[in-house]
Each structure stands twice: as structure tokens, then as C-alpha cells.
UniProtKB/Swiss-Prot annotation:
It is found in: Cytoplasm. Its EC number is 4.3.2.10. Belongs to the HisA/HisF family. The lineage of its organism: Bacteria, Pseudomonadati, Pseudomonadota, Alphaproteobacteria, Rhodobacterales. It comes from Cereibacter sphaeroides (strain ATCC 17029 / ATH 2.4.9) (Rhodobacter sphaeroides). It comes from the Bacteria. Heterodimer of HisH and HisF. IGPS catalyzes the conversion of PRFAR and glutamine to IGP, AICAR and glutamate. The HisF subunit catalyzes the cyclization activity that produces IGP and AICAR from PRFAR using the ammonia provided by the HisH subunit. This is Imidazole glycerol phosphate synthase subunit HisF. The gene is hisF. The keyword Membrane does not apply. One of its GO terms (cellular component) is cytoplasm.
Amino acid sequence: MLKTRIIPCLDVADGRVVKGVNFVDLRDAGDPVEAARAYDAAGADELCFLDIHATHENRGTMYDLVTRTAEQCFMPLTVGGGVRTHQDVRALLLAGADKVSFNSAAVADPTVVAEAADRFGSQCIVVAIDAKTVAPGRWEIFTHGGRRATGIDAVAFACDVASRGAGEILLTSMDRDGTRAGFNLPLTRAISDAVPIPVIASGGVGTLDHLVEGVTEGGASAVLAASIFHFGEFTIGEAKAHMASAGIPVRLA
């Protein structure tokens, strides 16, 4: 059985971590490479970098950051934010990313997913879906940092991009993000059941039980969290031990 992955996420702007990382052993809590090194040593299964400004002006900074991180870390690295074309994917893979995540660009033109998957393989193409509840059992995709409604049904879109060659879905509940109230489990379950590819649950983790629920109730293949790890409330090792004690197969740190 495949192991469930635990994935810390770093929000990066202009080459700096913006939701600070409060590790006592870091020389510079704002340096993504320092944070990545700490997570690598702690046994994280993967790391996600999201370039939240995502402008082409700072793309060179992001390429440099990916290269410096890949040189120092062994865990797979997913990079997203402002990825619009297969040329962007190629440049990030050459810089050292293992996977590249599309978000708004895939919503605007889903053919970009197929084009990238055909060129580089589905295994390195992630589609990030930011969804909000619009009615019981119905979720809509929002883009541009959650500011722009699309009217697109999240489950239908997930099925569409999976059929076009996406290798993985990074699913964030915008209703839960930052609330520490736990994942949106009905949303996570609906998409996990609808697609034949792995789903990473994101948005709302406040306790280790929430990580467990994302898998046991949400059906996720991986769980992503930020603040519970960044601020030192829990370690990756504690999270893995808790999930293992709940019967979830993990790669022990």
C-alpha cells in the first residue's frame, strides 16, 4: 500500500517565506532554503513552494531559490504560482523542481495541462484547485488568490484536468484555509472519489487529528499543512507517529 505523504508548504514572496517559520534552530526564519533544509532533516515527504506574488518579474528569484533548495534537499519539491505555459514548467524542472503546479492558468485554459503532461509526463504535473462552498455539496473554483469567482464546479473541473493528464490534485478549501478547524472533508471526499489520481488535502489543519481525518474521512493520498509545522507546534515526526498510530501507513521520519 502506498504511504500517505505529509507535505509542509512554504508561501514565498520575493524569495522570502512570508508566513514566518518559527524553528528555533534556523539562522534565518525568512529564508526558504533554511526552512526547506530543516523540513528535509525532519523527514518531510515532500515540500511545496508557492510563489504568492507570482509575477514574471520575480521569476528569476524563484528559479534561483528552487536551484539552491534542490542542491541541499533530497525530498521532492513542488513549485507553484504564476505557472502559465509549458515553458514555465520546463524552466522550473531545469531549476530543480520535481513537480510543477498549475492554478489559474489551468482554469483559464485546461489544454495547458495536457500540453505539459505530454511533454514532461503526468508524474510532474500538479493542478491546484482553490474551492469555496457555494451550496451544500457544491463547490466552486475561485482564482487569483480567491478573489475571482469562476462559476466552475470543482468536482467537474478535477475530473477534466485528470482526464487531460494531471498527475495530482492539490485541493485547498478556501472556507477552511487559515481557520485551523480541519479540512473540508465533504469536498475532499467528493474529489478523491471522483478522480483516479492522488489528491493532496490542504486548508484548515489545526491538530494532528485533522491530518488523520483528511485520509480516513476525506480519502486524500497526502496532507498538506503550514502553520502547525512552521510555528513549531508539532514536528513532522510527531505528525507521522500520530498518523501511524491511527493505522495510516506513513514513511516514518
